[in-house]
């Protein structure tokens, strides 16, 4: 399995590397799933903002990264949970609380891509895509 076959792992790695290099933004190939994940990151203050742009007939998503007062990334970790080789599904009751509730879980559910506390409130489980804190 090549890296590119897992676009979510690729997204997380690209963000992680860009943060370590102190980049202002990172460009990622667009998909509805990835946009939904990035939108949740934005809602929770983990990224500044994002925009979708066409370049050479390819849709790209430009994700603007966030750093704290001390110029350190506000994201401490991005962890892929479910993988193409080993899917991880959880019921609403088993959705993890991440890093003392400072972090978030992102799930793909029958009601779309949801943050853990939202899925828990709606009482829906799903595929546990990643954890961010």
From Swiss-Prot:
One of its GO terms (molecular function) is structural constituent of ribosome. Coiled coil: none annotated. Signal peptide: none annotated. Keywords: Ribonucleoprotein, Ribosomal protein, RNA-binding, rRNA-binding. GO terms for biological process: translation. One of its GO terms (cellular component) is ribosome. SUPFAM superfamilies: Ribosomal protein S8. InterPro entries: Ribosomal_uS8, Ribosomal_uS8_CS, Ribosomal_uS8_sf. Pfam families: Ribosomal_S8. It comes from the Bacteria. PROSITE patterns: RIBOSOMAL_S8 (PS00053). Belongs to the universal ribosomal protein uS8 family. One of the primary rRNA binding proteins, it binds directly to 16S rRNA central domain where it helps coordinate assembly of the platform of the 30S subunit. Part of the 30S ribosomal subunit. Contacts proteins S5 and S12. NCBIfam families: PRK00136.1 (NF001109). This is Small ribosomal subunit protein uS8. It comes from Chlamydia trachomatis serovar A (strain ATCC VR-571B / DSM 19440 / HAR-13).
